[in-house]
Amino acid sequence: MLIYARFAALILTALTLGLSFAHVLEMPAKLAYAPDVYLALQTSLYVSFGSPNVGAFVEPAAILAVVSLGYLVRRRRRALWLTMGSAVCLLLAFPVVFFIFTEPANAFFRVAHLTSLPADFEPYRRQWEYSHAARFVLHAAGFALLALSVLIRPRAAHSELSPFTGGAIQTQRERSYSSPSPSPY
């Protein structure tokens, strides 16, 4: 069960990261476009990113998968902290940054028309682009924390890696027999 939950969380978070990375890669060119070209792109290119298409469901599914994974690893302290850190990053990206910064710009672009471009177009364009850049940073941090939570191994009780046994785990009892006791002199 745990391996499937980890796989789902990684895939969904990677897809979310990919969607936000696409926006960041496009940002330099889009900021240079004329307002009419930019508005045409906004109203045609990003239709599949939003509701009712698949893009709108990937990010909430990633958040649910990561939070569910946190529940499954709740007894593994390091994995739990990393997984919950990932969840916090994803929850900051959506809904916090999205609804405070991105959605107001989306609402502006939904009502703006090419024939009557509003005078306050540029601040909304920058708000939309930079909010997606912020979301990308949060998604990247969330994915990195999630990957670390999957890659770390639980610590064995009272053990450490021994350079003398080829890196095999040595228990505290084995260490006391194999290492010389310090001289009292």
Language model feature labels by segment:
Residues 1-16, 68-93:
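Interfacial segments of alpha-helical transmembrane regions
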Residues 2-64, 107-126, 161-164:
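Interfacial loop at the N-terminal end of multi-pass membrane proteins
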Residues 69-88, 153-173, 177:
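Cytoplasmic juxtamembrane regions at transmembrane-helix boundaries
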Residues 85-109, 169-185:
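Hydrophobic alpha-helical transmembrane segments of integral membrane proteins
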